[in-house]
Regions:
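Cys/His-rich short segments
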Residues: 1-19
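Short hydrophobic beta-strand segments
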Residues: 19-26, 81-86
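Short, acidic/turn-prone active-site loops that include or flank metal/cofactor-
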Residues: 26-28, 53-54, 89-90, 136-141
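Short, charged, surface-exposed secondary-structure boundary motifs
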Residues: 32-33, 58-61, 141-147
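Histidine-anchored nucleotide/phosphate-binding helix
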Residues: 33-41
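S-adenosyl-L-methionine/SAH cofactor-binding core of RNA-modifying enzymes
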Residues: 41-119, 123
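C-terminal folded domains that constitute the principal catalytic or ligand-binding module
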Residues: 107, 115-177
Length: 177
């Protein structure tokens, strides 16, 4: 039995100083538990890029709603500090000190998918090669259980964006998200 629950009318549109670019694994467009969609609906200066869709593969309603644009270097601006949010071997912990060191506005690029899919996106997406990777500091386990996770500190895309915003733009902005 599938419960029908839509949160769309509860989302308050918000424009951040930080630009959010979500690079979504194509299989995520088939999942109703995808929290990146909520983030995109709420955050006015966000973009979603679908990655890995095979040519000729039918588009899901979610993919059609968000767009079918592929991520490329053209999505990156030299006028902004482009950061990939994912805990990789090369990522540094996002902190107030790091944020203050940037002279340009920030674009936060967030891989979206299962943990396995999301880990592959920065490695396989040529446009993300050479960008600085950041990770969230240790925090409490997720407040949400949209899916079964293998580790209590794995969090959904929406929650990761919110926690990053607490550091980038302050706790008030994170609470609004």
């Amino acid at each position: 039995m599938r419960l029908s629950l839509c949160l769309c009318n509860l989302l308050k549109p918000l424009t951040l100083k930080t630009e959010i670019q979500i690079v979504m694994h194509h299989r995520e467009t088939k999942l109703y538990s995808n929290s990146a969609r909520l983030a995109h609906l709420m955050l006015k200066n966000s973009r979603v890029f679908i990655r890995g869709r095979e040519e000729g593969e039918p588009l899901t309603p979610l993919a059609l709603e968000m767009g079918t644009e592929q991520f490329s270097k053209a999505a990156l601006s030299s006028e902004r500090e482009n950061l990939v949010l994912f805990p990789s071997e090369t990522s540094v912990e996002l902190s107030d000190e790091i944020v203050r060191s940037f002279k340009k506005p920030i674009t936060l690029i967030v891989p979206d998918g299962s943990w396995r899919q999301a880990a592959r996106i920065p490695k396989r997406e040529p446009a993300l090669q050479g960008l600085k990777h950041v990770k969230l500091p240790p925090g409490p386990p997720s407040n949400y259980r949209l899916r079964r996770e293998h580790h209590p500190h794995y969090i959904c895309t929406f929650e990761a964006i919110s926690r990053a915003q607490a550091i980038l733009e302050g706790p008030k902005t994170a609470r609004e998200i």
